[in-house]
């Protein structure tokens, strides 16, 4: 089974009618709406790739970790799109969840998705309780107020913002979770995998800042120009277009070198290199007027 199919199959199972039970019908429909069809599934792909590089001796735990991470990411997107935050009408080329349903249901759907992720991790405790506990702790740490994605969103309410701290929390946290949870799922220590996740996360955030400044809404599948509209801290505002491009290159240059020693190190390096090429695929100048 391909990596894509493995991840998608695990997500479908986690959000199946059998898994959701007797949920209110609209909420039961809203949960998969917020997850399918997916984007690139970058975070769970990195997680599973790291687990495979480390031996992937417990695939059920790896799959649960990948599902929990992607559900947390999707929940954050549902909440990001709400009028209280980005007020975005489009997500992944279709109406954002609060537009397709309503705002209260979108809040509940986002909450339910992140809770479902922790349920999936708790369930796999029957397979390997030690790893499940570590995964729950790691995902909680990198989702909350202590440098997790909640902290990243909260930085936007501060008058003075450290761009590096903001990027690490807003985007980097779940990429750090991807590399560290992949290692944990395969029985490896998490700490050596921090730097790789941090670099990949920083690169994606800088690239996202550049795309927000240069690309059209049609090309991105979501509203463009949101950083300026919402007065968010961003790399382009701080460094300029060319400065942000140079910083992106510098961040990516050290990503492969930061891969810890593991049995599948060479193959993992190829995957990181592939993502680096994709990340750098940004227009040279603005596509919109």
Curated annotation (Swiss-Prot):
Pathway as given in its UniProt record: Isoprenoid biosynthesis; geranylgeranyl diphosphate biosynthesis; geranylgeranyl diphosphate from farnesyl diphosphate and isopentenyl diphosphate: step 1/1
Binding, isopentenyl diphosphate: 43, 73, 92
Molecular functions per Gene Ontology: geranylgeranyl diphosphate synthase activity; metal ion binding
InterPro entries noted in UniProt: Isoprenoid_synthase_dom_sf (IPR008949), Polyprenyl_synt (IPR000092), Polyprenyl_synt_CS (IPR033749)
Note on cofactor: Binds 2 Mg(2+) ions per subunit.
Binding positions for (2E,6E)-farnesyl diphosphate per the UniProt entry: 91, 170-171, 205
Membrane spanning stretches: none
Binding site for Mg(2+) 2: 80, 86
Keyword terms: Carotenoid biosynthesis, Chlorophyll biosynthesis, Isoprene biosynthesis, Magnesium, Metal-binding, Photosynthesis, Transferase
Binding site for Mg(2+) 1: 80, 86
Chain's role: Catalyzes the condensation of farnesyl diphosphate (FPP) and isopentenyl diphosphate (IPP) to yield geranylgeranyl diphosphate (GGPP) needed for biosynthesis of carotenoids and diterpenes.
Identification of the protein by name: Geranylgeranyl diphosphate synthase
Cofactor: Mg(2+)
BP terms from Gene Ontology: carotenoid biosynthetic process; chlorophyll biosynthetic process; geranylgeranyl diphosphate biosynthetic process; photosynthesis
Gene3D superfamilies linked: Farnesyl Diphosphate Synthase (1.10.600.10)
EC code(s) of this entry: 2.5.1.29
Catalytic activity: isopentenyl diphosphate + (2E,6E)-farnesyl diphosphate = (2E,6E,10E)-geranylgeranyl diphosphate + diphosphate
Similarity comment: Belongs to the FPP/GGPP synthase family.
């Amino acid at each position: 089974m391909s990596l894509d199919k493995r991840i998608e199959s695990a997500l479908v199972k986690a959000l199946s009618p059998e898994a959701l039970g007797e949920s209110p019908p609209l909420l039961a429909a809203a949960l998969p709406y917020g997850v399918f069809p997916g984007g690139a599934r970058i975070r769970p792909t990195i997680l599973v790739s790291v687990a495979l590089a480390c031996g992937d001796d417990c695939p059920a735990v790896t799959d649960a970790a990948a599902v929990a991470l992607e559900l947390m990411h999707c929940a954050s997107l549902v909440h990001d799109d709400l009028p209280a935050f980005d007020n975005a009408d489009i997500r992944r080329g279709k109406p954002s969840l609060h537009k397709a349903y309503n705002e209260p249901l979108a809040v509940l759907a986002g909450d339910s998705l992140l809770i479902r992720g922790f349920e999936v991790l708790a369930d796999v405790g029957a397979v390997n309780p030690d790893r499940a506990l570590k995964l729950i702790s790691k995902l909680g740490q990198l989702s909350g107020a202590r440098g997790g994605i909640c902290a990243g969103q909260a930085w936007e309410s501060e008058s003075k913002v450290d761009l590096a701290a903001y990027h690490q929390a807003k985007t980097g946290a779940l990429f750090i979770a991807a590399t560290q949870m992949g290692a944990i799922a395969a029985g490896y220590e998490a700490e050596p995998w921090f730097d790789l996740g941090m670099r990949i996360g920083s690169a994606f955030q800088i690239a996202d800042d550049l795309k927000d400044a240069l690309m059209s809404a049609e090309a991105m599948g979501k509203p463009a120009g949101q950083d300026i509209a919402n007065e968010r801290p961003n790399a382009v505002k701080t460094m300029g277009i060319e400065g942000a491009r140079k910083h992106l290159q510098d961040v990516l240059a050290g990503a492969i070198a930061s891969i810890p020693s593991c049995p599948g190190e060479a193959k993992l390096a190829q995957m990181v290199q592939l993502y680096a090429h994709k990340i750098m695929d940004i227009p040279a100048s603005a596509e919109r007027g």
